[in-house]
Amino acid sequence: MEIPVATYRIQFTPSFGFDQAKAIASYLAELGISDLYASPILTARKGSTHGYDTVNPNQINPELGGREKFLELVAELKNFHIGWVQDIVPNHMAFDSQNHMLVDVLENGFDSQYREFFDIDWHHHYPENKGKVLAPFLGKFCGDCLESGELKLQYEENGLTINYYSLKFPIRIESYSQVFTYDLGRIRDKLGRDHPHFMKLLSVLYMLKYIPSGEEGRERYDQIIIIKRMLWELWNDSPEIQEFIEYSIRAFNGEPGKPESFNHLENLLAEQFFRLAYWKVGNEELNYRRFFTVNDLISLKIEDEQVFHTTHACMLKLVQEGTISGLRIDHIDGLYDPAQYLTRLREHAPEVYLVVEKILEPHEELPINWSIQGTTGYDFLNQVNGIFCQQCVAPEFDTIYQRFLGRKVCCEELIDQNKRLIISRHLAGDIDNLAHLLKQISGRYRYASDFTMYGLKAALVEILALFPVYRTYISSAGTSKADREYIKQVMTQAKKNIPNFLNELNFIEKFLILDIDEHLSPEDQEQWLHFLMRLQQFTGPLMAKGVEDTVLYVYNRLISLNEVGSHPTHFGISLEDFHTFNQQRASQWPHAMNATSTHDTKRGEDMRARINVLSEIPQEWEIHLKEWREINAPYKETVNRQDVPTPNDEYFFYQSLIGAFPFKDDEYPGFVERIQEYIIKAIREAKVHTEWIKPDTAYENAFTNFADRVLKDPHNNPFLEAFRPFQRKIQHYGILNSLSQTLLKATAPGLPDFYQGSELWDLSLVDPDNRRPVDFEIRQKYLQDIKTKAAQDLSGLIAELLQTPEDGRVKLFLTYQLLQARRVYLDVFQRGTYVKLSVAGSLKSHVVTFARELADTRIIAIAPRFLTSLVKEGEYPLGEQVWHETRIVPPAGSSDVWYDAITGHKVQGEDTLWLREILQQFPVALLVNHVETSTTEDKNQEAE
């Protein structure tokens, strides 16, 4: 197995495809990247900017360049010894007419060869859904769409479809006779009964009466092909037949203003294997599993072996050919049986590097029995982010936040309220389906046959709302100790909350702990297990939508802590916890990813690094908040008897400005537009004053108008005059945090993952802002300049970079130096032990340090933090005037010569390493203890 040295995430889009990536191959290699980490590359919906909406799992996306350009890119990368880690999406595909497997299901229903591919309940409890797939994509009620003429019957080579703007739904072949026999006498009289074209049409109509069904699958498909081909020939060969078909379609499409004219189309729709509906119906009457709450992403039954092989054939072939060396599994928690899936995948790809997108709650551990290398790095992200938040000021920050809002805020209550909101408003249909499944089972169980739907659903809602993690992994293989503890915790609290439903809770608890009665039939036991497996698929979406996509936009105490996988009640983490996390990682998951920015993070890594600085100066932060609120009060509008923005949204706004404010003046106009777009997304996600399913445009416009007034005219603006000095101060200390964070990412157990463009400052907001095009030309230019100057005068280069940190070159330089060192001492970083080091002196809490050891090589990472109290704005934490007697005790057995892989500086110290001697030129250090004292560049040459 090839373990990456460092990965670089690329977001492929139609405007940045394989050719564009080929142009940066040499740059990635020079930077020190070992593997390109690609967003999904299989064929997605046309124009897709992310690739998670796959429509063909066995074709490389033509919009990215197709297979030919893909192989050219891979070959170019291999020339530079760069591998390929591929993001794959086993959970879902696009619900779209471009998805031919799904179209086949919509056209053929139970007779489709793909009927078991998608997670559809064909026997749904709502009669109108039985034997159909709900298609909740209409912008208003179905009847209104019908009578307004928005639903159009259309005929083309592939047959009849119902079109709703760009959406197309296939008409089942059995319904063709409705259309093609409409006023049949008209064409008979026109052509004559014996006309060959009319006779051919009659033969088609006779064939339509005897469409094979059931076991005669292949014959059915053959006959459909013949019928469609004959009809298309008639369309092309006979102007009279063409006019007849057009006439029939016009009749079916009706005339707005005449409701009765749509009866034919309504009857035709009633026969189909799909049920068109208003999009909001999807939240309540859904009969297929979605990705989270996204109606147009339909889930696969990937647990079915045939589905697995069909959807993975292309990727596994690329793995087996050696084209792809790593896989990243998207949304592992959505799968029916994640462990089974990973086992099956590993059987087909035994040597592939394998990581999963798994969101771990604080102190939650990854299942140790999964045959993978680890997670994609959100767990590391929250650990490294947390150590730059000063924990001791949590009570003070609570007070500041609540004083600004004028009310108390309890995050735990917000989590509970919003999970219940998501259950009632966005996942109601999913929970309803679970409750009906449970009711079916209880009806066949003598001790639960009297339980009502009301009681069972109330118990289910309580359990789901209380779930403390994204999901458990209980299966027929058993239950882990951790999962048993989670279940115990949930059930204990649920029984306290709703004691009137104790019997129902006890019944469900039997499922959750696999306490299945032996006297049950094998079929009943299988149903019990199925319910448990199904329930576990929905705790993740609830956590994601209730907390990650709601509470993290509502609880704004310190928004740098509101990140994927975080728990916003945790105000930073202790150094002790950080070291414990790293020690566990080194022993259990040494090859997991260390991420600091991804395509899904709420903020770019350097935006978070800035906002964390506020935790060091809470009193100053509150003074400025009051000042800004007073200055900006005249810019607020009143909507529904409240000033906009509300205090909570205004508090969020100022933090966002501090974090994302651009370094360069020429970026300012674009920044204002980005902030306004961000505001809309953030407040809709918060679901307090507006939301996606019911936008309040009055509130939204008032807030964006406020932002426009506050930020307009940067040269004559009272707010900016008050804001910019404080923002510049935060910016400076944020830079120092960022450099420390970069060092820790590259040296802690795991491998560093760099999100596209983040080798310079990453002040991105949430997607789609973080998927903006990356200027690789300037990065290539900067890197060449750094390499040239470093070879001539490394100390001079460092001084230059620290004088002009705004352009981001200092971060690029650090990244480059760290990745070169990582390549030279790869074994130490991949296999070395993790040693927590002791720091002595009055400033010991301001230093994060640890060692990596393997054989006779020791490497020490030194990253300062909490620097507002140590250096003035514009200064760097360098030399004796800052660090005084602060010192590190190196690992036992070290020699007395250390070499800084960042600056080339040599340090003496066998028993003690003084920070005043180490941090003389650069704010962070990477000390290498080796007999030789050659530079990293010399080491590289030796390695070659």
Q: What is the predicted role of each segment?
A:
Residues 1-46, 58-59, 63, 71, ...:
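Carbohydrate-interacting/catalytic domains
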Residues 48-56, 92-121, 369-378, 771:
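Aromatic- and acidic-residue-enriched segments that line the glycan-binding/catalytic groove
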Residues 80-81:
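Helix C-cap/helix->beta junction micro-motif
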Residues 88-95, 835:
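Short, glycine/charge-rich beta-strand/loop segments that flank catalytic centers
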Residues 91, 328-335, 803:
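Conserved short loop/turn motifs at secondary-structure junctions
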Residues 94-95, 106, 402-405, 435-436:
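Alpha-helical transmembrane segments and their helix-helix packing motifs
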Residues 96-174:
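Active-site region of glycoside hydrolase catalytic domains
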